[in-house]
Amino acid sequence: MARVEIEIPDDVTAEVDHLDLTVEGPEGSVTRRLWYPDVDVSVEDDAVVVASEVDDAKTDSTVGTFESHVANMFHGVSEGWEYKLEVHYSHFPMQVDVEGEEVVIQNFLGEKAARRTQIRGDTDVVVDDEEVTLSGPSIEDVGQTAADIEQLTRVTDKDTRVFQDGVYIVEKPAKGGA
């Protein structure tokens, strides 16, 4: 019999459409499907209510998980999420660019072919010399884009003690930061 109310911030609106919760604010909007058997998500007055009539551990933990998702959505649309990555190279000067909806890394370890990865969702990517900044309203989209960029420059066939070239996440939001 878990019931949690998450207060909606002043500059944010929330709306439930069947199983999808849509949250809009000054930084953008985020939609997420929140479904689990016997767990109901609704908007009442100035709060999002996550409730369940079933009293078991799995359902109670799911209510807590949904509470965290909603809090992350509120934080994302009001303040946004930000990751910082740094470009490191010692052998070949690599170049990181944004082309449309892709991040392109050229001359990684002297490779002639460019490495590419998609930018997810509403994530903004800003490349400033040796620093890459990712920001957006969805923590999942921003975090996954950062991880994709980091994995794109992973060195697998050389000694990583010598070849430390790559793009690495150096700053990300703290857990429980919402």
UniProtKB/Swiss-Prot annotation:
Q: What is this protein for, i.e. what is its function? A: This protein binds to the 23S rRNA, and is important in its secondary structure. It is located near the subunit interface in the base of the L7/L12 stalk, and near the tRNA binding site of the peptidyltransferase center.
Name of protein: Large ribosomal subunit protein uL6
InterPro entries membership: Ribosomal_uL6-like (IPR000702), Ribosomal_uL6-like_a/b-dom_sf (IPR036789), Ribosomal_uL6_a/b-dom (IPR020040), Ribosomal_uL6_arc (IPR019907), Ribosomal_uL6_CS2 (IPR002359)
Q: What quaternary arrangement does the UniProt entry report?
A: Part of the 50S ribosomal subunit.
Q: What's one GO MF term for it?
A: rRNA binding
The UniProt keyword set, sorted, is:
Ribonucleoprotein, Ribosomal protein, RNA-binding, rRNA-binding
Q: Which SUPFAM superfamilies match?
A: Ribosomal protein L6
Name any Gene Ontology BP term: cytoplasmic translation
